[in-house]
Amino acid sequence: LVMSTARHHRSNRGLFDQRSLALEEPEPQPQVLTAPARKHLWFCIYLPNLPLEASGPGDEARAVVAEQQGVHRVLLASGRAEAAGIMPGQSANAALALLPTLHIEPRSEIVEQQALENLACWLEQFTSVVCFAGADVLLVEIAGSLRLYGGLLSLRQQIAAGLEQQGFNASLAIAPTPLAATWLARGGRRACIRDTANIAAALRTVPLASLDWPAATCESLAGMGIRSVGDCLRLPREGFARRFGPQRLIELDRALGRLPDPRSSWRAPERFCADYELTEEQSDCELLLAICRELLLSLERFLLTRQLGTQRVLFSFFHLKGSATQLP
């Protein structure tokens, strides 16, 4: 079912002997008076349950499965399914044996991407800078929006409430750099850091698993007893870069605000098009109407964000056989 609209109006001294990753204080330099640079503030939205939540909110017992070595295994399960004993890693057959009424959905990265894009569209009402930072992470730059939305606390509450209303269980964090905000959110630290000088302290206990670094790098560091960002920052810089590559050091410096971290802002297409993929043929009118209403709500968010209207809405119903049915 597709609906579209027309165009709108991270110390091992035996291995390292250089300076630690924490930079030494530079010699004081004469100050030149310049216009103050605009401070950034990044709001990160991490969606750890996106594969389950992408298909929309629901109270029923559900599980998302993914194929692993030829076996379909549970990736995520809803609260009601978990209460019945369904856990990630179980085979789909074992899950159904525990709960025959369990609704199983195959993971769809397309549906997840669409849900993330819909969320990005909704976030554009708060700021013009919306960035994708992974398959389950969105970043918005909010420094310029604070006054308009009643300050940081008010803006955070509005975004958090909107996410909950749309059925998303998000981990949120705010920091002056996009990477710091992302690592804090992925580490489950619901932090709000406004000063760059406080980033290192906030990141100290964040586990390396939250950094999205290669597994081999994290395993090698863990073998040395390095398990957090704070552990990494105590290592000598040159030795760290030589052993693990300069990119990891660059990422740490970007997270701490020592290096710039430019991001590309995402813009929604001018033409709205949304679809809903059914797992099987359906003739239930009430179900189809509910799906249409969900698509219309997505359109409403798209239009309200841009203060636009549309003159025409087209629904297309694709059948297993035969041509599509279109309802203008």
Q: Across the structure, where does each feature detected by a protein language model lie?
A:
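Residues that scaffold, gate, or flank divalent-cation-dependent active/transport sites
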Residues: 2-139, 144-146, 153-161, 170, ...
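Stable alpha-helical structural segments in soluble proteins, enriched in small hydrophobic residues
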Residues: 115-118, 174-194, 198-199, 256, ...
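Amphipathic, charged-and-aliphatic alpha-helical interface segments
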Residues: 79, 84-86, 198-234
